[in-house]
Amino acid sequence: MNILKKLLWFVAAACVLFGCADDRMIYKPGSGSGNSGNGGGGEQPSGPGDYSKLTAANHPRIIMTEDDVMAIKTKLTAGTDANLKKLHECIMAYADKALTAKDLVYEVKGKRLLDVSTEAANRIISCSYAYRLTGEDKYLEKAEKDMQTVCAFKDWNSASHFLDWAEMAHGVGIGYDWLYDRLGDATKKSAEKAIQDYAFYCALNGKWNLNFYTSATNWNQVCNGGLVVAALAVYETCQDDARSIIDKAI
């Protein structure tokens, strides 16, 4: 996959996970009912997955690697790819806006923490990208601060609205992976614990109606996407749970 395609995938994923994550489930928690699509989108993967490269020495690894970062920098410097330039400027603009944004606060509206989760994920991902591309500490510091804030929340609202948790796990997972070599040990430990307690535990122990695994709504992409990103990010710290999450999603 070339660099432009990877960045386009990133932007598309952001649109799905952030822009389209509204409440479209047609069943209630614990009801056991719901829309369970039959798939049919192509061949299913077979055989055991290869997890051998998911080590502490191999970050960043989700969506883009360090080689991809260097290739993006080279293309941007050359100035020959107008589409890449526009995408880069769009992400950087969001990161710059995030630098002066107010601190995130645990605020549930109705049954949702979704607005906070969306803002957290957008900030963390855009600032993590900005740091990898520019090396400017202001982006690292902002992303790390927002990660620390949401990981100190009492929960990610998974008991009431699973989309909230999924977006939070996606943002923290990307921040953890892309900034791994620069995050403080306390921040990494906090992220690992939050992902385990607020995400994996809820999914693996049936704390929500788990029909999102086969649902034909946006809950499938958002919930499975957030779970898998988080599992890939912290795999080496909780291999059994992370592998269970990934295998079930696939």
Regions found by a protein language model. Name each.
Residues 10, 15, 25, 61-62, ...:
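Detector for intrinsically disordered, low-structure N-terminal pre-sequences
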Residues 16-54:
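Bacterial Sec-dependent N-terminal signal peptides
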Residues 72-77, 83-92, 96-250:
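Aromatic-lined, polymer-binding surfaces characteristic
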Residues 47-93:
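N-terminal mature-domain "stem" immediately C-terminal to a signal peptide or N-terminal signal-anchor/transmembrane
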Residues 1-5, 27, 34-37, 141:
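Generic cytosolic/nucleocytoplasmic N-terminal low-complexity/intrinsically disordered segments
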